[in-house]
């Protein structure tokens, strides 16, 4: 649900169950956005429209393109709106819609139809709002899809990223969604079996975990509930580990820094590692890389705000020259009597380094000098003794 975030969100449950105090600190941090988050949000909205249309219109399976031609309901109009939003974000709607439809929507819909054949009262909930307060203080969340029927609750989670495969077995996020469904929309049903499925269509991967109503409830009461209470109060100990990789406060967390430093100091020379130690260190690399990236991002943010970071500054990064008007450049080269075969690499001009070899430096400047631009390099961190001048942060946008 855009705009609303629980202090103890299901998606971060592995983190706050492992490291309870991190939740309260993360709640004070601004939400981070990225192109990947925008893409993921659009993918989920496309999936929601498609799956809702299949359910409400009782459609036969078709293609993602065919759904744009459906005259009933608002599915075509809704998808065209999302098509426009993808275009504005520089994203390929056809690729996203086709992947989500074939890899996720049809899977859920076909399983829903199988449930209906066994139990005509089966329900399919799409983007189901779940009240989790029985187990998590002020807890709520949304499950991408929930099927309730045939004495079973089946919960689905679409993950559109293509980074790492996620296992559904004993996955706390999925178990929390299942608890929310069992003690919410399915509260009036007799439920024996619980099924949890993570679908990652871009990795052609899905993972499924099945348990019983009794097993899930026991975990909710005796594992989740006390862990959530501790995290909500900000109590417990900081406990670093692989879960730090996605923590927004990792860059300023002394415990995470100490853990990372201890790893580096313990295993300084890889050539001295035993095979079992090498395997352990490999398992920690994602954490170390993630922590280092967060530290760099935080330092960059502070310096761009004009705040000092001991021993560091922002300088202009490497920039590449380019020709601003390819057509005009080609016409000038023709007029200068240059053999175009020596300067063209279909369908455009060769790079400037290759052009310099043909025209020599002075010829390049004479013919094309005013068409050559060199944009400002991307800001990058550098030590204070770096010979490049420090960039002056533009803080004017803070007052707009």
Model-derived segments and their meaning:
Residues 5-55, 279, 283, 311, ...:
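Nuclease catalytic cores
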Residues 32, 165-167, 274:
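Alpha-helix N-cap/helix-initiation motif
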Residues 38, 42-126, 211:
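A non-catalytic, helix-rich entry segment at domain boundaries
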Residues 47-51, 178, 296:
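Short, amphipathic alpha-helical segments that act as regulatory/interfacial helices
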Residues 64-82, 243, 250, 300-327:
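Charge-rich, acidic-biased intrinsically disordered regions
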Residues 79, 86, 118-230:
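Mg2+/Mn2+-dependent nuclease catalytic core
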Residues 195, 218-287, 389-400:
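Short, charged, low-complexity amphipathic alpha-helix
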Residues 290-400:
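Extended, charge-rich alpha-helical segments
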